[in-house]
Amino acid sequence: MADDLDGDIRRLADLLAGSERCVAMTGVRLGATEDTEAAAAGSAWGEFASLEVLLTEPARFWENWLPRAIEASEREVTPAHRALARLEGAGVIHAIITQAVDHLHARAGDGDLIEVHANVLSCRCARCDDVYALSEVQGLIDAADDGVPRCTREGCGYPLRPTGTLWGEPLVEEAIIRAWDMAAWCDLFLVLDTQLRTDPMAMLPSVPLKRGGKVAI
């Protein structure tokens, strides 16, 4: 088993050394410590973190979503995040596409980061787009009679929503377009810590393959 692992590591090192345009894709659990990842990532969050629940049972949505969003925002950068950031800093990796919502890649120092689900670090007004930190949202929930945070801008008062995507919503269009462009551009596509179960991201590794690139999973 150790010999097989050593051989895989050597082959990956050779692929990286021979690549001029490497792009990495990471899954939702690279920085997770438990099953508390974002709705769009296909985890237990999908039971309540959906657009439908937000619209029909907003108090239940916020009761369940906000503690998990806070947990995700407080996660520590892992050695895997640091290693990828160092590879990007050294020019070995040129961009990172991630399904994660904890923003840990950015905190690790990744410069060219594509977050296809955005992240859970903030919420926004669904009408005027004012942005609120999670701590502010908690205060608004505590002060609300119905447990629903609302915009504090004078004359607005519209309910807030997470900045990131929810079940039942399309992914961030600009990020998806850029992810496809980078997958088509690269000559080596690394797939890390994702089971490739959710479309359209599950189809992304096929893009470089069709253009003669290599994929390492």
Regions found by a protein language model. Give the residues of each.
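Conserved catalytic core of sirtuin-type NAD+-dependent deacylases
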Residues: M1-I217
